From Swiss-Prot:
It comes from the Eukaryota. PANTHER family: TRNA-DIHYDROURIDINE(47) SYNTHASE [NAD(P)(+)]-LIKE (PTHR45846:SF1). It comes from Sclerotinia sclerotiorum (strain ATCC 18683 / 1980 / Ss-1). Keywords: Cytoplasm, Flavoprotein, FMN, Metal-binding, mRNA processing, NAD, NADP, Nucleus, Oxidoreductase, Repeat, tRNA processing, Zinc, Zinc-finger. Residues 13-28, 61-72, 118-130 have a biased composition (Basic and acidic residues). This is tRNA-dihydrouridine(47) synthase [NAD(P)(+)].
Amino acid sequence: MTDEIPNPVQPEKSLKRPLDGEQLEEAHPPQPILPEDSAVTKAEKVERNGANGNSVSNEEPVAKRIKTEEQNHNSTATDSRDRVRGIAPIKAEYLLHPAGSRSATDGRNPAANDDAAEEKPRGDNRDNGGKKKKKEKGQNKDRQFGSWGDKIKLCNSTSNSPEFSPKECSFGESCKCEHDLRKYLAEGKRGDLTTFNSKCPVWEDNGTCLAGWKCRFVGSHSKEVKREDGRMELVLIEDLERMRTTVAGDEEALGGVVNVVSTKDKLDLARRRTKMEKSDLYTNWLDKNSEEVNRQSNLRKDQKNDQTQEEKEENRARYVEPPFLPSEKRRIYFGPETPVLAPLTTQGNLPFRRLCVELGAQLTYSEMAMSIPLFQGQKSEWALMKAHESEITPPRINPDRSSIVQNYNNSKDLKFGTQISANKPFQAIKAAEILSRFVPHLRVIDLNCGCPIELVYRQGAGSALLDAPSKLEKMIRGMNAVSGEVPITAKIRMGTMTGKPTALKTIERLAFGGVESRERLGAPGCAAITLHGRSRQQRYTKNADWSYIAECAALVKSYNQKKDDLTDTIMEPDARTLPNAPDGKLHFIGNGDCYSHVDYLDHIQNASVDSVMVARGALIKPWLFEEIEKGQTLDKSASERLQYIEKFARYGLEAWGSDEMGVGQTRRFLLEWLSFAHRYVPAGILEHLPPSLQDRPPAYRGRNDLETLLASDNYMDWMKICEMFLGPAHEGFKFQPKHKSNSYEIEAEG
């Protein structure tokens, strides 16, 4: 199976799994490779897991580094009230062990290893003592993970049709699926779920259910009717008044889902029938222009000085203008009233974003998509572009703010943007063109320049772009040229190496362009920059450096003045080369460790950022956006938190379907979310506020049994929570938490 998974960054290079070496403690256990995984997720899993499912690393385990740092942190107190750094200050009556006892220290929950959620560096031949790896044979050599589905597969020609009038099966007599509906219902699928009052959430919302007879709630929208000949026929029920009109005839658009790309468009991309004239023209010009720039830069200084005026004029004449200028962009706005939900791999799925928008998130991003699979038409990558209709509504703004962009029209703005990754300019440029063409509801296209994942970094994408500023500028400039009215933004880190920040230079380049291109081409056109206050090397260890973010914010604030200084006094810059023209405002967003409204306000006021992007804080408590809006800490009860989990389950069934596959998919992503959400410590049992994202609690009990259950770090308890809304797991279902070396495998029923 792994041989069929392409490299999403560089297709010409095959993915290699690490060799079997010494058995190590797993920091990130094997994850199942599923068809619906995005390209980068599939590739990560291939490179991360050994032949026997064992991770191999040539670096010191991240968990060990974290433990060492915590020991150093815990040795000092942060205030006069003996608040110990790194330990959540829980009131004494809720502690399971007396304060100061050894049990109190031993009973602390283990540190959540957020680095384990990222890929571990792969090993090499030395990890296996130089021995040649024995190649496994057979098509099922990687079938070590769980799966879920119906025992008997019902043919699609029957799945949504009345019993006596199915559609014509395109496979005819050679079809291997079941066509006997009653046999399928009796033997092929599990019984109906009794959750959600035994009513199908999809049918309740749309008046129809796309899963048809495969639905785990099919009894709520089907009946048996008597025909004239006396036979009893099974039929599906539809509520015509509640049925929604699908977009472009695509059934996937039900349930308030937008940005659904048609199967025809994806097939045209896969078969290279889609023309990308703008991208081809621009990349051809870019290649020729780069050759001339390289030729000039390779001249020795004395050669340049010896050039005659005529030779200099001839060199200038060799430069060819770009084939076209960018279109003027839609104005966008970031402000204190627009907190941003970060692009979250795996966790940033549509149901979770929908929940966050409901709780006050004003701007959202898709999960990071790889550029090559996008313009190759891969279904799993285009699925990341789907958004809920609540994400295409305008963000909430304060119209009285003096910093608001000139000519900004809030009614034309929306919340949802997408993020892509690429390691070559042509990849990013092509992806930007097809996204602006096929995705109608798109606020921005963000280029990821901060992803620390080893697979992405090693091949020149993600945070590796921070060490290739010229290439990064070409990407932004090219994307800006072909994206129509959709603005281009970038998300960066402080740098790749700890103690050697490069973000100031990167920001200056994104704002003005490099010295070699600034005079001829103007600004690259980056509309906004988000800075994560850590280096790639730090990953998620140590606190985000907001003092450095503030230093970068000061540079961005001087952007307009410096832009005027660099502008020729005779010629005004072309508005099409500037973000948010006519004033050319560059927005700046900070990112890192925001976990309360106090953190948010502090960063806005003291770091002088336009807005703050929230990541792990929102995963642990998605009502953080509500706290920011109200300006207070909210002590959510256990029942309220359970309602959010129920909403996620409902939204998941609406997004992924209510059949066995959809229920399993919803269960999987709900468990992924609970692996973060269980870290929340209720505000009402803390001695000190605001809470810190880096604090971990000692062993404690909640104010009631449900609160204690929600705080459990045992994945079996997470399974119990899921079963409240999704019923018992399929016998083949497995779950392996990202942050722990354990897994769940349900015992066979009966």
